[in-house]
Amino acid sequence: LIPWQNQWYCPQGTQGIAPERIELLDDSVWLGDGSVALVRTKGHTEGNHSIVAHTGQGLLVTSENGVSLDAYEPKHSSISGLADFAKRTGAEVIINGNTQEYVVDQYISMVQEKSIAGPSPVDDRFPNVVPSSEAQPYWLFPGTAPTARSGSFEFGRFVVPA
């Protein structure tokens, strides 16, 4: 492992889970009636998948690849310098900085995610992508508050089959 991966590595991460309960995925898969899919989006990790759901608010993608809606449409960002950086470099998305070993895959996956997602119900200039670790404004870092935030969502409920 490279140094910045050590803190995230879980050597016994599946300990206690029966092997027959683990399903290894090589590609994207549909779940249930097809209204939810796990889409392979290598980048954040080697086996990363994004959850895509057909909701009352359109197609929604949730992922660990980006940290804010600004990352998926930097040209609309109000964060100081972000829109200018995207324009100068031609960057369609802005990757987060914690997985440099897969930077190309992460960039491609973020473009894929925003292409799948419908428009955001919060601000239709942005895709309907909900980062699993969404950036939050913080007073110690002025000027870095996301332009728009997805916030929390609740859709349906889990039901255990009889």
Q: How would you label these PLM feature ranges?
A:
Residues L1-R40, A86-I95, T99-I108, E113, ...:
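Metallo-beta-lactamase
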Residues W30, K42, V52-H54:
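Well-ordered beta-strand positions
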Residues V52, G56-A162:
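Cap/insert and terminal regions of metallo-dependent hydrolase folds
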Residues D26, K42, E64-G66:
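Residues at the C-termini of beta-strands that transition into short coil/loop
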Residues V39-N48:
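Histidine-centered catalytic micro-motifs
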